Amino acid sequence: MYKAAIEIAAPPARIFEFLTDPKHLQSWQPDVVEAKPLPPGGLQVGAHVGATVQEYGRRFDVDLLVASMKRNEHIAYRMDAPTASAYVEYQIVPWGPKTLVVSTGAMRPKGFLRSLYPLLQGLIQRMVQRKMASRLMLLRTAVETHA
């Protein structure tokens, strides 16, 4: 299980917008090459959303299934990509004059990565933890500087 948290000087509704609106996705998820539009009916539990991602020299599609959601409070996705499946959740908590965003996630390697995971587990865990923290820092910058 991975976890990262950050305080952002913005109300929960503004942060939720940046977490869920495809037009803001690239501002805090730099690996996203193309964010797919929201499905008919919008974002809701059971909806599939997705993106085309480029990381580590590979370009691939990622499918996200909204597993749970309470607008302006939390959203959780089940993610499926070629090298891993994951569960990722964002909790949005009013925190004095700021808002605390807590991201948690669990990952299951698949494909070629699954066989290498026992050897590379420590390295992969550090990379995932660092990536989660850096994405939250980018989210804070995007939310706080967007007019």
Predicted segments — roles?
Residues K36-P82, Y87, W95, L100, ...:
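Glycine-rich portal/gate segments that line the openings of hydrophobic small-molecule binding cavities
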Residues M1-P39, Q44, L138, E144-A147:
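Hydrophobic ligand-binding cavity/cleft-lining segments
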